[in-house]
Curated annotation (Swiss-Prot):
Database matches in Pfam families: ATP-synt_D (PF01813)
Function per UniProt: Component of the A-type ATP synthase that produces ATP from ADP in the presence of a proton gradient across the membrane.
Protein name as catalogued: A-type ATP synthase subunit D
Localization, UniProt: Cell membrane
Keyword set includes Cell membrane: yes
Quaternary structure and interacting proteins, as annotated: Has multiple subunits with at least A(3), B(3), C, D, E, F, H, I and proteolipid K(x).
Organism of derivation: Sulfurisphaera tokodaii (strain DSM 16993 / JCM 10545 / NBRC 100140 / 7) (Sulfolobus tokodaii)
Alphabetical GO biological process terms: proton motive force-driven plasma membrane ATP synthesis
Main localization of the protein described in the UniProt heading: membrane
Length: 216
């Protein structure tokens, strides 16, 4: 939008200056928000990296223990154990708000973990150990999912915030400042023209008064 489309009036100049001050305040708030989002992102990224390594190691140990159980029991027996246990795990979902950003939360319902899924069947301790370990690993996997969601949501909000800052710097503030400069220039020109006009009128009046005095 061209700044010349705005009527060059004092009221518009006052309003534009208010808009400039308000826009600069909004920009500072957005910059503060950006810094806070970056802090949260760094924290989540560091926590995610640590937890990812922990989960990877835990799953490796679970797999090794499970393989020892398979070696002891046989794959067909282990499969029959697995088929005899009905699915029971459940997760609970919720939302939390972090600095205005909605982040989904997913947690394992620990009440849904069966304490003795195999009943009175005697199974290899490796199978029991791997089963307990995978339940613990699943909790941490859900924590990873939550962290990924948080990182994704915070990154999206960060991009939106940066786009707003860019819009202020590239379009909004330049438009307001150029419009204010244009109006001030027009008003200054009018003031100078009015000053010159009044000065000329004063000279004419003084000359006429001088002529009237001379005619007496």
């Amino acid at each position: 939008m061209s700044s010349r489309k705005i009527l060059p009036t004092k009221l518009n100049l006052i309003n534009l200056r208010k808009q400039i001050r308000l826009t600069r305040t909004i920009k500072r708030l957005l910059e503060n928000k950006r810094e806070v989002l970056l802090i949260y992102l760094r924290e989540y990224a560091n926590e995610y990296e640590k937890l990812y390594s922990e989960v990877s190691q835990l799953l490796k140990e679970v797999y090794e223990t499970y393989l020892m159980g398979v070696s002891a029991e046989g794959i067909s027996t282990v499969e029959s154990y697995a088929n005899s246990v009905p699915p029971s795990l459940q997760v609970k979902s919720d939302l939390k708000v972090l600095f205005g950003v909605r982040i989904p939360i997913v947690k394992l319902d620990e009440n849904s973990i069966q304490p003795q899924p195999f009943g009175d069947i005697e199974v290899s301790p490796y199978i029991t150990k791997s089963r307990d370990a995978i339940a613990e690993a699943f909790k941490k996997i859900l924590e990873l999912v939550e962290m990924e969601s948080a990182i994704r949501s915070l990154s999206t909000e960060l991009r939106k915030t940066q786009r707003l800052i860019n819009a202020i710097d590239s379009y909004i503030l330049p438009y307001y400042t150029s419009s204010a400069k244009y109006i001030k220039g027009v008003l200054d020109d009018r003031t100078r023209e009015e000053f010159v006009r009044l000065k000329m009128i004063r000279k004419v009046l003084q000359r006429r008064r001088g002529e009237n005095v001379g005619n007496r």
